[in-house]
Design a protein with these regions (language model features):
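Membrane-embedded alpha-helical bundles of multi-pass transporters/translocases
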Residues: 2-229
């Protein structure tokens, strides 16, 4: 190894040694590990859920509803939070952090309002929606799906707001919090299922998803509040 490094020109070797020890590279490595860990934990959670429930009508219904709610939250997050990031950075450079944070609070309130309106619309059209999404289900499974849509609305609100807070934190270079917070959803779900392992049902999945998203949101809020004046 030393013979290989000896063949590298001195300026390049010096640059590499400084780069490998830099805080920036260490931060990138940490974010990479956390992001990769999040994918692994999510896979383990899914495998644990499948092994626990096996072939189950409840699991079929939950996966359908959870997938739709996650898609709806991600779809709503594709608008305001994504356009917020460049506007926040530009305003912070031109007018200062206080003015930019004020805009961030206003934008977060608008995004929360849009999520609340979406939740209200879902409540009003849940019967028609499930009729189209779950047309192959029997009546019992359709009724369960309608109940799960309503019961997963806290997840919709918390998960949807996490996109806004994620953009806010990324704008302030809080990459570790952004990378680590998604771990809380699968970890909480697995924890709740372990507590109820003797009699697992769909209620554990709903509780785990709602609690995990709430914990994720609280972690982000804590990080944001610590940087506000």
């Amino acid at each position: 190894m030393s013979s290989i490094s000896a063949r590298i020109p001195a300026p390049l070797r010096s640059l590499l040694s400084r780069g490998l020890g830099s805080a920036l590279l260490s931060g990138l490595a940490g974010v990479f590990v956390l992001t990769l860990g999040g994918k692994v934990v999510s896979f383990v959670k899914d495998a644990f859920v499948v092994s626990t429930f096996g072939v189950s009508d409840q699991l079929d219904v939950f996966m359908l509803v959870f997938g739709f709610v996650t898609f709806a939250a991600s779809l709503l997050a594709g608008g305001l939070p994504e356009s917020f990031l460049p506007a926040y950075v530009e305003l912070k450079l031109q007018k200062g952090a206080r003015r930019a944070d004020r805009m961030a609070v206003q934008t977060s309130a608008c995004h929360l309002l849009s999520l609340l309106m979406a939740a209200l619309v879902l409540i009003m059209i849940v019967h028609m929606l499930i009729g189209h999404l779950a047309h192959g289900f029997d009546e019992t499974k359709k009724q369960l799906a309608q109940q799960l849509v309503v019961r997963l609305l806290p997840f919709l609100l918390c998960f949807g707001m996490s996109f806004q807070f994620s953009a806010w934190l990324r704008a302030n270079k809080k990459f570790f919090i952004v990378a680590a917070s998604p771990l809380l959803v699968p970890l909480t779900t697995v924890s709740v299922m372990l507590v109820t392992l003797r009699a697992p049902d769909v209620n554990a999945l709903v509780l785990g998803a709602n609690l995990g998203a709430a914990f994720q949101l609280c972690l982000m809020l804590s990080a944001i509040s610590s940087q506000l004046p």
